[in-house]
């Protein structure tokens, strides 16, 4: 990246320029580039103000600016950008710098630091200095692939949460049945352990790995509860054996609970 001396070179500026050069070699429609970044904006840490500024930048460009061999340069004045975003000058500069630092836009600086540009009769940019949106074109494939991965992980997380919910309800049903029928066994300790395990339930936006660990914890604990439950019913029964067996059958039916059976309730 060529620096004219008035802007201090940084690694982030260099990376942004590399993305801009890569974007110039591609032909990515403006709508595709903008849709790609919008779909993952929150996931990569962009704030609403960042997205608003990107929209203002994009609105200044034309479709032909995104063709191969060209760069979508934005030379809009600060006044124009402030009017379209509602930002103060300081806020505008701060978010523009952030977009550069994360490699979404680049600076194309004139020798005096002023933004300006010129189009020919066909509307193509002949010469321009300002904010360069070519990095968005360069990273469109990256962001589209990221969105696919994010959606797949979300589907996996939803499935794991349903499984955790089912296992949790099986455990609760057995503990409640044991308490109701005063079954012999370490039920007080198991109930206390279950309450502690519930405190380890993941919050929102947990990773697949965290949910897998949680499912393993609950599945292992379910085996302990089922073992205690089976031991209680393997001992000689009194005159209430038939009633106790009905309780066992009722709780065992909870194993047949399916995700569709609880889909209307909050999982985990």
Label the model's feature ranges.
Residues 1-73, 125, 184, 188, ...:
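Short recognition helix of helix-turn-helix/winged-helix DNA-binding domains
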Residues 51-55, 79, 97:
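N-terminal, well-ordered alpha-helical segments
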Residues 68-86, 99:
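A short alpha-helical element within helix-turn-helix/winged-helix DNA-binding domains
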Residues 100-212:
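Winged-helix/helix-turn-helix nucleic-acid-interaction surface
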Residues 156, 172-268:
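Electrostatic interaction modules used in gene-expression and signaling proteins
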């Amino acid at each position: 990246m060529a620096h004219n001396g008035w802007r201090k070179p940084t690694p982030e500026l260099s990376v942004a320029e590399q993305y801009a050069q890569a974007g110039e070699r591609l032909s990515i429609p403006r709508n595709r580039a903008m849709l790609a970044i919008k779909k993952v904006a929150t996931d990569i840490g962009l704030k609403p103000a960042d997205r608003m500024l990107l929209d203002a930048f994009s609105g200044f460009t034309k479709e032909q600016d995104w063709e191969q061999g060209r760069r979508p340069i934005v030379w809009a004045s600060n006044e124009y950008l402030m009017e379209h975003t509602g930002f103060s000058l300081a806020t505008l500069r701060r978010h523009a710098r952030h977009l550069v630092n994360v490699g979404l836009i680049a600076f194309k600086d004139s020798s005096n630091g002023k933004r300006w540009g010129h189009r020919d009769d066909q509307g193509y940019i002949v010469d321009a200095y300002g904010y360069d949106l070519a990095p968005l074109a360069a990273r469109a494939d990256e962001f589209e692939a990221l969105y696919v991965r994010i959606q797949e992980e979300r589907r996996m997380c939803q499935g794991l949460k349903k499984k955790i919910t089912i296992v949790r309800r099986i455990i609760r049903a057995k503990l409640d049945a044991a308490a109701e029928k005063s079954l012999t066994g370490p039920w007080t300790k198991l109930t206390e352990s279950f309450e502690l395990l519930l405190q380890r339930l993941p919050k929102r936006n947990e990773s697949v790995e965290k949910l897998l660990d949680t499912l393993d914890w609950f599945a292992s604990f379910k085996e302990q509860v089922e073992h205690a439950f089976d031991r209680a019913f393997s001992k000689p029964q009194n005159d209430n054996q038939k009633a106790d067996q009905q309780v066992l059958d009722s709780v065992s039916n909870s194993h047949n609970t399916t995700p569709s059976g609880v889909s209307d309730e909050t999982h985990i």
